[in-house]
C-alpha cells in the first residue's frame, strides 16, 4: 500500500494539485490512509468509506480465491479457471458484497462487475489483495500519527469489513470521527450515493477553509 500511496503522491506533484481531499473506499481507504501517514503534507484530509484500516486475520470468503501468493499459480488460474469460477459464483459474490442491501440494478454491466471476470483483472486484484495483506501490519499501530482531518463513513451491517474493528476502533485509536449508517452494507458508493456525496462535500468544505 505504501507503494501505491507513493504513486499517488507523485501524481499529485506532477499535476501540481494543491492538497486535495483524498476519498477512499474499502481497500482504497487503506491506500488513502497510507498516503496520509507517509505524505501528509501533500493532502488536505481524508474521507474514508468502509475502509480497511486494521490487519485482516480472516480473508472474507468472496476474496479467498484471490489470496494467491504464488505468481505462477496466479497466472495459471487466471488463464484457466478464474473466469468460469467467477461466473459460477457471481450471484453469491455480489449478494455478499452488497448485503444486507439489494445488489444495484444491472451491476454486472453498468457497475462494471463483469470486468472482474477477465484474466487481467483477476491477476491485478489478486496482487493487490496479497500486497494489502502483507503491508497492512506496517500501518496498524500508527493511527495516532494521523495529522490530517479525517472522517469515516461505514455501514452498520457491512459483511466485508467489521464496522467495530475497521470503523469504530480506528476512530477511537486515531481520534477521528465516524458516521455509521444503520442497516447499510459495504457498497455505500453504489447503494447510498446521496449519503456519500453529502459526506464527501462536507469534508471538502471543512478542509478547504
Describe each model-derived feature in a short phrase:
Residues 21, 44-47:
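Residue in the alpha/beta-hydrolase core beta-strand immediately N-terminal to the catalytic nucleophile
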Residues 13-19, 40-41, 147-148, 175:
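Active-site acidic short loop of glycosyltransferases
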Residues 150-184:
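Conserved loop-alpha-helix segment in the C-terminal half of the alpha/beta-hydrolase fold
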Residues 24, 28, 32:
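Gly/Ala-rich beta-loop-alpha elbow adjacent to hydrolase catalytic centers
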